[in-house]
Amino acid sequence: MTFYSVRMRASLQGQHISGAETLVSCPTDVPRLTAQFVERAMNHAKGVPDAITTKIESIPESDIQRVPRLLTREYQARDCHDAHGFVQQQLTTVCSAEVAQKAVDLLLTIRNMRGAILLDAHSARRLEPDHNRGIRASNFGDASSISAKPDNKEIGISKNHYHEALILSSKVMSAPGIIAEICISDDPDYTTGYVSLNGVYTRVHTMKRLGSPLGGRVFILDSEKASVATAINHIENTPVLIL
C-alpha cells in the first residue's frame, strides 16, 4: 500500500499563519484534503495569507513507523500564572528546575518562529541549527482516520486544536532523546496549551489571554540519549502513524 503525505503551510509577509498535514492511504482523499487545508488557511484568525504552499508526497507503507498516542489528561488553571507554574513544575520531573524555567521563559518570549525550539536537558542551551526556522514536526498522521473518511470538522476546514496537537505531540515524543514538549497555540482565539512528558499529554487551560498572538513550542532533548541530528531527523522526516 502507498500512503500520501499532504501538507500545507501559509504565511503573511513572511510570518507563519497556518499549517496542517496528514497521512492518507486513499488517492482520492488527496485533492479533497488539499482544498480543505487551503480553505482553512484563507479563513484564519491571524489574517489572510499572501503565500500558501502545499506539498504532496507518496510514501511506501514499509517506511512508516507506527507509535501509540499519548495518554491524556487536563489541568484547569486558575489563571495564566497558575498555568505557567504548573507546566514548569511538571517539567521538573524530567529535568532540572533551571532547564524547566528556561523552557517556560522561552515559550513565553519567543515570537514568529516557524518551528520549535530544541532545548538541551542538561545545559539549557538551544540546539536547533537555525534559530529562526526552528524544528518543524512533519510527516505524521492519525491511523484512525485512514480506515474512515475524514470529517471536515476533524481534519479539514475547521481546526480541532486538541486532536491535531495530540497527534503531533505523540510523534514528537516518539523521537529518540526527546523527554518533554511544551506548547501554546499561536491562534489568538485559542488559549489552551499543553505539556507532554512521561507518556502523558496534559492540556493546560489559560496558558495565555484571549486575543494574544503569543504561541510556540519547545522540545527538550536529553543529549546523552540521542544526538541532535538523530532527534531532528525523526521529528522532521520519519513518517509516523499514531495509533
Swiss-Prot record:
Q: Which domain of life is it from?
A: Bacteria
| Pfam families linked | BioW
Q: In which pathway does it act?
A: Metabolic intermediate metabolism; pimeloyl-CoA biosynthesis; pimeloyl-CoA from pimelate: step 1/1
Q: Which cofactor does it need?
A: Mg(2+)
Annotated EC: 6.2.1.14
The reaction(s) this protein catalyses: heptanedioate + ATP + CoA = 6-carboxyhexanoyl-CoA + AMP + diphosphate
**Entry keywords, A to Z:** ATP-binding, Biotin biosynthesis, Ligase, Magnesium, Nucleotide-binding
Q: Which GO terms describe its biological process?
A: biotin biosynthetic process
GO molecular function terms listed in the Swiss-Prot or TrEMBL record: 6-carboxyhexanoate-CoA ligase activity; ATP binding; magnesium ion binding
Spell out the InterPro entries in the cross-references: BioW
State the HAMAP family in the record.
BioW (MF_00668)
Subunit info?
Homodimer.
What is this protein for, i.e. what is its function? Answer: Catalyzes the transformation of pimelate into pimeloyl-CoA with concomitant hydrolysis of ATP to AMP.
> What's the family?
Belongs to the BioW family.
| Record-given protein name | 6-carboxyhexanoate--CoA ligase
User: What is the name of the gene encoding this protein?
Assistant: bioW
